[in-house]
């Protein structure tokens, strides 16, 4: 299968060394003492603790804004409020960013300024997930700061433009990342490359913020200080084993948060710890002596939430037959294996394999996930309405 000539490969390096050299590849780690899987009887203890600490901060800010608007407004029993940002690619990111800027007291003098500080939850999918990932993954700077220090340059020189990708060193680095993930025992798909390309535009740091995992947000100062709403990104399940390519309207909605991944939907009804995504589990217990970390790379997750490659719904064509940026992406993955239709999906070792409560997916060793808006619910309101989350939401 033909490869682009600019690829830089490390064929002479052992697979274990390749994995160790990359910040993208999953890494073995000691398993936690707490259970890795729980049934979805409510939100996790960690999320509950965060919300308990966030609630008085959010209520004070919301009450201050309401009395600023109307001094007679009663603030005795305020609801928890959630902000959601829909899919829509870059347009959604930019319009959603404008909304946040107008609501953020650090960044605006508009009449709506201060409402962001009153939020308890924030959710996004697809383009909205890009926004939330960029905001949370960079420790919640102002939108103005992201615009001037990252987005303006990154969007102008987008790596999703083939000429830009081939001209810079990012192409070789992303290639190395994907090869390292494969060397660690996790075959990559085109979503890995896609997520890495997006991360270069949305996350600060070396190699497109490769060291930023979703779970690492729990250590960021604005999160530990409970200064920000609790973030959730959504994605959809596709039962590829049944021969379908796209999710039905009633498909399972998966939630990614800094603490957990899973779903309240019947058929899954379970959650696992985000930090240990990638760990081989059977009925909730590890099948090996170690667990895996780094699988929750934030670039991969924001790529998962915006994965529409499954809409091709066909056996993956040869690299030479694919136009534009998809040819570049395909060529990188083709270094590791012959492409199939499964490369159109974001794949995750199924943490609910043989788990009693997850009847829909308990027989599947792998989950195949796609864009969170493909089931015609383009706004991620589900996390905000799942008990006992927010009692009100707006977008």
Residue ranges and their predicted role:
Residues 126:
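Catalytic nucleophile serine of serine hydrolases
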Residues 379-395:
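A short alpha/beta connector and helix-capping loop motif
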Residues 16-89, 107:
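Signal-peptide-cleavage-adjacent N-terminal segments of secreted and extracellular proteins
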Residues 1-20:
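Fungal secretory targeting signals
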Residues 82, 86, 90-96, 105-107, ...:
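Patatin-like phospholipase A catalytic core
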